[in-house]
Amino acid sequence: MRLVSTDGKKMSIIICRLVVSARRFEWFNVSKELSIYRHLDGKIIILDFFTYCCINCMHILPDLDVLEKQFSVADGLIVIGVHSAKFANERDSKSLLSAIQRYNITHPVVNDPALTTWRDLGISCWPTLAMIGPTGEVLAVFVGEGHRDELVLFVNVALKYFKSLNKISERDNVPLQLARHLLPVTEDDSLLFPSKLEIYLNEQREMLIVADTGNNRIFIMDTNGDVDHVVGGPNPGFNDGDFHNAKFNAPQGVCILGDSVYVADNENHSIRKIDLRKKMVTTVVGTGVQGHDYVGGKNGTDQALSSPWDVAIYKHEHCENGMVPVLLIAIAGTHQIWALFLKDTTWWKNREYKAGTCVAIVGSGREENRNNAYPHAAGLAQPSGLIVVQEKKMLFFADSESSAVRSVDLRSGRVSVVCGANRDPTDLHDYGDCDGVRHAAKLQHPLGIAWHLEEQLLYVADTYNHKIKKVDVTTGYCKTVYGDGKPKETFSLNEPSGIAISPNKGLVYVADTNNHSVKVIDTRREVITTLQMNIPRIDVSDGTNNVYTFDTSISEKGGELTILLKIIFLEHDLKLNSNAPQRWSVNQSSGGNAGWVATSTGGPLSNPLVINVLEGIGIHEVPLILDIIACKATECLPKKCSVVYRVHQKADASSVLTEEREIVVK
């Protein structure tokens, strides 16, 4: 922060120039451009010089929100965002509109693509806040993030002082019209700014995890779009709990280990774990508020983080325990890569870490494009996408602000360039859109990265070029393959930020962020389609408390499936009332057309459900409702649970099957 003593008349001219020249540009969040005489005269003005790619610019948005809630326009304060783009793509007003919507910016914003006001005021870095007095004088300039307390103090003092001089206007006629009203209407099965994807295999199906960032939730579905679980959403929050009550805030990267999905809960500055078996969400790292630690070493929720953007699992060779899992975390806020040790681990240079310890392992914390054999001497620039290639013992990452793909040797910690960026480690402005080798290749703020197992190549979401590119990690050759009308006109993307590749089908799944969709690219047929999601419509108007989905397989020739259901309560003082009816019922009306018939439409929970599956192929859904009475010492509670049993008919499956499934009830 610095105080400014300057010619008030000159500054007033500069502010007038901002407003007058801005008529040639575009305003956002207002119905018409602001006038210095009708709207800004007699106000304390905070000019926020930002570029929407910048993590530090994102970090001050909560500070501005606090400021605007404490001091209204009628009180004499108005905040104006002056978008001063770093990247070429950011100069486009459509791209800026999406960013304003994505980050829920609610104050007026003007797009200054030529950086006219930036130069007039001598601004030198993002973000910078200029505090302007009611007659055009610059009162203070705050450079960088972390000035919330000073901002509140200065605005409070300035308002009191200028009110005593009768120079503050209480007029509140700013024509606000928020950009969010232009967003598509979000339905239960639609996405809003999806960011990251992960593919995994369970016993029966190829599964897809989607971070529906704008709706603050996670979808667990198969790669055909059939949704098993919706976790969190739609409003932001920071709550652990079951899938319905848990809350995220702009979740980004996802990865899976066993039955656990790890989530980079970006704006909660934490790592969350989704337990698919227990159907519960817990916080494993982070305090819920932004940290400023560049070292780490604390355990779990005692360790503060700063804007985790992606996560990946590495199976580290441990001399005593064999392979131990380590969760790698792209910490965009401090320009580092951290590790959460899920078990006791001997790490690089024989450092010992206890299970639950979270520590910085790569990056000095300086925003640079500096490669180095020593991991803590390397400089990263907002790492935003991670992929572990286990057989190579390598981590590859999309280093967004250096516009590069880089690597970490997970045996030693050496950081190297794969492609993109400049040879000068301090030059973070060498971006473009060019195929080539190593530094000759140019990218523009890449965010997503995946490994194509069959091709042995990286696929990169080159976000601000709206393209997907292939990278040979041995030669460093980078080539555009999809997007911006290539290979066909139908291949059009808008800031893709996540990518995942099916190891079985060879399909590429892309989080097409600003198009609010997941695109599926068939690389063999060169066809691109939009993934249609299907959420089973469960009628919960009758008080259904929980929804459960299970999968099983039976022969294409048909057969008999016997299902036994066992109730388990998370609350230890809950138990089934032995004197009350505990029943299941099945919707028989959907069975005949679906290729199955139940031998009974209902019965006590102690009796199995028997399904006769007819000869055929495909997937059949058997819907069940469980009506149970659970009791504590002093009260009994009725509960309804909805179960969707998916029966897959396969050639190599058994024709007679008995299964016992656990229903975990909160």
Where in the sequence are the language-model features?
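A short beta-strand-turn-helix
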Residues: 21-45, 68
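Short active-site neighborhood of thiol/selenol oxidoreductases, capturing the structured segment around
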Residues: 35-58, 79
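Structural microenvironment flanking redox-active thiols in thiol-disulfide oxidoreductases
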Residues: 59-102, 113-117
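Short, internal strand/loop/helix patches
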Residues: 97-126, 130-132
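Thiol-/selenol-based redox modules, centered on thioredoxin-like
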Residues: 133-195, 536-544
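Gly/Pro-rich loop segments of beta-rich domains
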Residues: 169-195, 225-250, 280-310, 347-382, ...
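Residue-level detector of Asp-centered blade-edge/turn motifs that repeat once per structural unit
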Residues: 199-205, 256-258, 313-324, 388-392, ...
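Extracellular/lumen-exposed scaffold segments
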Residues: 525-526, 532-666
